[in-house]
Amino acid sequence: MGIPVFFKTLITDYQNVIEPVDGQKIDNLFFDLNCLLHPSCASIKDGNEDSMIQKIIADIDTLIQLTGATFVYIAIDGPAPKGKMMQQRVRRLKSVLEEKVWDTNAITPGTNFMNRLNDELHQLYDGKSNVILSDSLEPGEGEHKILQYMKQHKSVL
């Protein structure tokens, strides 16, 4: 779970913490795809899920190209522990009351949208030796999956 407005606060109030890489290559790119899912989906105003999936894939490809990463680990939030499920349910029920073209509850493990996204990402990345995808069917939050992978493979990172 992210910290609301954290990144925006960092780049606004502490501009010196971010430096351009100026052509430096990044060996390992780890990212929690949920940080990309919401803005990518929100940018598709008509709520077309096919367009959303294509936008997500295009955004992933852009990130990989911009960084020049030789290894990529993509983590998507999986089913949450029971304690967090109630918190998520309350938050999502509140968001349903807002009028939206597309219901962001679809960005939940087990929904048709997430299953389709998982399938598309597996088709793209399963044969690639330099990309690992931990999809939304694997339990755990994206950032926890990333940290677990890093701990298990620290000798090669």
Language-model-detected regions and their locations in the chain:
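Noncatalytic, typically N-terminal accessory segments of nucleic acid-processing enzymes
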Residues: 1-157
